[in-house]
Amino acid sequence: MSRKKQAPVRNVLADPVFNSKLITKAINCTMLEGKKTTAQNILYSAFKLVEEKLQKDALEVFRQAVKNVTPLTEVRSRRIGGTNYQVPMEVRQKRQQTLALRWLILFARKRNEKTMIVKLANEIIDAYNKTGGAFKKKEDTHKMAEANRAFAHFKW
């Protein structure tokens, strides 16, 4: 166990446009090399694109997309008697949101569209429609947990 103190959880300020902490966290995940205004422009432009394509409120679409991508269970390695077992565990609330945002942005970056704005908008739409890379990642995570259910009694 680490002897150091755990870092205190810092309060995230709500973003200026939508007044949402979830959007601020998404901006921070999108940000590269400390360029926050660029990340904000990308996210807000992607939201405009989502509104144009779906004719629905972008914030509600984004919240539903994050909800669709949020994992409930995951597997974690545990060493018992010289063997590593993949033990399925429930994911804590904060980690659920973090993983969902991380996967959305990761799979948006992997897409083949021209700009990050279009990539992110299409990944949000796909997650909203329960398709796309981020949703597939969630499904794969749940399948792994289901496949290793026999080791659930090794929880700690």
From Swiss-Prot:
NCBIfam families: rpsG_bact
Keywords of this entry: Ribonucleoprotein, Ribosomal protein, RNA-binding, rRNA-binding, tRNA-binding
Keyword ATP-binding belongs to the record: no
Species in which this protein is naturally found: Mesomycoplasma hyopneumoniae (strain 7448)
Keyword tRNA-binding: yes
GO cellular component: small ribosomal subunit
Cross-referenced Gene3D superfamilies: Ribosomal protein S7 domain
Similarity section: Belongs to the universal ribosomal protein uS7 family.
Protein name listed in UniProt: Small ribosomal subunit protein uS7
Function: One of the primary rRNA binding proteins, it binds directly to 16S rRNA where it nucleates assembly of the head domain of the 30S subunit. Is located at the subunit interface close to the decoding center, probably blocks exit of the E-site tRNA.
Quaternary structure and interacting proteins, as annotated: Part of the 30S ribosomal subunit. Contacts proteins S9 and S11.
GO molecular-function terms, A-Z: rRNA binding; structural constituent of ribosome; tRNA binding
Source species, domain of life: Bacteria
Entry's Gene Ontology BP terms: translation
Cross-referenced PANTHER family: RIBOSOMAL PROTEIN S7
